[in-house]
Swiss-Prot record:
Residues given in the record as Zn(2+) binding sites: C145, C148, C158, C161
Reaction(s) this enzyme catalyzes, per UniProt: tRNA(Met) + L-methionine + ATP = L-methionyl-tRNA(Met) + AMP + diphosphate
Subcellular location: Cytoplasm
Cofactor binding: number and manner: Binds 1 zinc ion per subunit.
Name of this chain's protein: Methionine--tRNA ligase
UniProtKB keywords: Aminoacyl-tRNA synthetase, ATP-binding, Cytoplasm, Ligase, Metal-binding, Nucleotide-binding, Protein biosynthesis, Zinc
Cofactor(s) in the UniProt record: Zn(2+)
Short sequence motif 'KMSKS' region: positions: 331-335
Length: 550
């Protein structure tokens, strides 16, 4: 039996820059669509997200910007929260890894892993700056790549040849901040023995949902596990118990932010223990949405961390990954100028246009591309030509002919067949949402709009009106409005504003919009909603849903 309680998380956005369309399509729009759909089904949904606020990239860029670390992450936390709100991402609580609950639970995770014999302190050689009097983590280091000889290679990866390595392997390493040469010194770090958990992890991933093309990647990753450092020589982060001047590596503390973020939510509603009903109850269904570059952390490392705890933390049931979204064939990059100003875009084009196109091109199993020409084509062909045209022509015809109150139609066989086909497509859309396919859901939405348009054309009520066959005209309009009611229903997870507008125009008697939150429609997707026998419609003046993109 499916769980009535649904926990949803999407990858915590790193507080080191603005969000772009690639981020939105990869983790936040898919999670929002799924959350909205599950609420329609009447599930108790909790969608948690928040800023990932520790790590080297943050400290380095804050220093380069002349800002304090907290000041820097505060800036991006607010920006991310505002961006998600503008995009209609219905996150229930947007927390941050600097929340007051986070340090204690991260340290508790670490101690439990120590108690299980899965942590070990090892002494290794690390790069040290005599001038700055501290060890430098990889992003603070530049030098000559040991593979290709590129002389401005980063401390963890060469931008020229793509090689990855330890910072100490660089030739002529120097500080990124001062340019001074670095030396090697011994330092102690804690290592997580992931390789000791291979069999347990292989069994675990057999039982969770992964996109088929990702499963082999995850299995290979598990088979090649090795000890992994969980600590760094930084001042910004969660302090490590028993190791002076060390903080936890961001990959270790960040996923625990899903739990501490839920604690933060529980505190905000005045029920500090409310987090437990989502994280300590195995009957909950837990779905995570991440980009493909986060797959290993969420499919293997975070579950391994949870397995080593004394509390039975809920592990992921479905890990929904996305490939990369490219911009005109290239990766989104602020430094390269390959970016779209999201605020400016939304000032020009409606939110639902953007949400629909991003959903229709979602990089679910392979990289996809955002190109303005395709955006224009999909808006004008799909949203204006098919979807908007169907809704507008029906409501406008009804208003023009005074047929605004519709109920108890006299249905013919062709009407019943049309209604049955509309119901079938609506249920197909539900399957696509359950299977995390935004692309297929978009296709089905357009199929239903095309079905409605075809029915209205075939029945040609304007001809019947000339013959004064008004009962038949009203029956056709009733069926068309019923189709629009379902069209709004299956569109709502992707285009919530548009769905709300359609329902407002046709005013189904079965739907009391006054009692609903537009952002969190609850318990609408029911058998009663699909029943047409007692339905009625009270049509209002038509509103233009979409305008042509020039």
């Amino acid at each position: 039996m499916a769980s009535s309680r649904i926990l949803i998380t999407s990858a915590l956005p790193y507080a080191n820059g603005p969000l772009h369309f690639g981020h939105i399509t990869g983790a936040y729009l898919p999670a929002d669509v799924y959350a909205r759909f599950q609420r329609l089904l009447g599930k108790e949904v909790l969608y948690i997200c928040g800023s990932d606020e520790y790590g080297i990239a943050i400290t380095l860029n804050a220093e380069l910007a002349g800002m304090g670390y907290q000041e820097y992450v505060d800036m991006y936390h607010k920006l991310h929260k505002d961006t998600l709100k503008k995009l209609g991402i219905s996150v229930d609580f947007f927390s941050r890894t600097t929340n007051p609950h986070h340090p204690a639970i991260v340290q508790d995770f670490y101690r439990n892993l120590q108690d299980k014999g899965l942590m070990e302190n090892l002494v290794t050689d690390q790069l040290y700056s005599e001038e700055e009097e501290k060890f430098l983590a990889d992003r603070y280091v530049v030098g000559t790549c040991p593979k290709c000889g590129f002389d401005r290679a980063r401390g963890d990866e060469c931008q020229q040849c793509g090689a990855d390595y330890e910072a100490r392997d660089l030739k002529d390493p120097r500080s990124k901040l001062t340019g001074k040469a670095l030396s090697l010194r011994e330092t102690e770090h804690a290592y997580f023995h992931l390789e000791r958990m291979k069999e347990e992890l292989l069994t675990f991933v057999e039982g969770i949902y992964l996109r088929p093309h990702m499963r082999n990647f995850v299995i290979d990753y598990i088979k090649n596990l090795r000890p992994r450092a969980v600590t760094r020589d930084l001042s910004w982060g969660v302090p490590v118990p028993g190791l002076e001047n060390k903080v936890f590596y961001v990959w270790f503390d960040a996923p625990i932010g899903y739990i501490s973020g839920t604690m933060d939510w529980a505190a905000s509603i005045g029920d500090p223990d409310a987090w437990k009903k989502f994280w300590l109850d195995d009957k909950v269904t837990y779905t995570q949405f991440v980009g493909k570059d986060n797959t290993s952390f969420h499919s293997v490392i975070f579950p391994a961390m949870e397995m080593g705890q004394s509390l039975p933390y809920k592990k992921v049931d479905a890990l929904v990954t996305s490939e990369f979204l490219l911009l005109e064939g290239f990766q989104f990059s602020k430094s390269e100028g390959n970016i779209i100003d999201m605020d400016a875009f939304l000032e020009t084009y409606s939110l639902d246009k953007l949400r629909y196109v991003l959903a229709a091109i979602a990089p679910e199993t392979s990289d996809s591309e955002f190109a303005f020409q395709e955006f224009k084509t999909r808006c004008n062909s799909d949203l204006v030509g098919k979807f908007g045209n169907f809704v507008n022509r029906v409501v406008a015809f009804a208003a023009k002919n005074g047929c605004t109150e519709l109920s108890h139609p006299q249905l013919e066989q062709q009407d019943l067949e049309f209604i049955a086909e509309a119901q079938k497509l609506a249920k197909e859309a539900a399957d696509h949402y359950q299977q995390y396919s935004l692309r297929k859901a978009c296709s089905t939405i357009m199929e239903l709009a095309a079905l409605g348009n075809g029915y209205f054309n075939d029945q040609a009520p304007w001809k019947l009106a000339k013959e004064d066959l008004w009962n038949r005209v009203r029956s056709i309009l009733f069926c068309a409005c019923y189709c629009q009611k379902l069209l709004a229903l299956i569109s709502y997870p992707i285009m919530p504003e548009t769905a709300w507008t359609i329902w407002g125009m046709i005013a189904p008697g079965s739907l009391d919009l006054r009692s609903q939150d537009p952002e969190r429609l609850q318990s609408i997707w029911t058998e009663a909603f699909f029943d047409y026998s007692e339905e009625s419609f009270s049509l209002k003046e038509p509103e233009l849903l979409f305008t042509v993109v020039e």
